[in-house]
């Protein structure tokens, strides 16, 4: 019954922008919220000093949260007709 009320969500560049913004927000939030950073493997690229101790587990955790957040934001914006 709930699925019948959700609008058809097709991918558009604006949906992609919302997902990117939600992921950036989640990474920024996770940067300060994760208390035990740097316990797992690091990223294979050089990062600025701002992200010191931000490794693969932290990246996977924050982007997973960002995608969950984006799913809710996109659904809400689609339902409101703003997207």
Swiss-Prot record:
Alphabetical keyword list: Membrane, Photosynthesis, Photosystem I, Thylakoid, Transmembrane, Transmembrane helix
Record field: transmembrane: 12-30, 68-83
Record membrane topology: Multi-pass membrane protein
Listed InterPro entries: PSI_centre_PsaK_sf, PSI_PsaG/PsaK, PSI_PsaK, PSI_PsaK_bact
GO annotation terms (biological process): photosynthesis
Coiled-coil blocks: none
Subcellular location(s) of the protein: Cellular thylakoid membrane
GO cellular component: photosystem I; plasma membrane-derived thylakoid membrane
Chain residues in the propeptide: 1-4
Family of this protein: Belongs to the PsaG/PsaK family.
Protein name as it appears in the record: Photosystem I reaction center subunit PsaK
Gene behind the chain: psaK
């Amino acid at each position: 019954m709930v699925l019948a009320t959700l609008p058809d969500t097709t991918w558009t560049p604006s949906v992609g922008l919302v997902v990117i913004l939600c992921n950036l927000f989640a990474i920024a939030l996770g940067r300060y919220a994760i208390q035990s950073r740097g316990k797992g493997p690091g990223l294979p690229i050089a990062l600025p000093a701002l992200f010191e101790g931000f490794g693969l587990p932290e990246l996977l955790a924050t982007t997973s949260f960002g995608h969950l957040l984006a799913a809710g934001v996109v659904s809400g914006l689609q339902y409101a007709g703003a997207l």
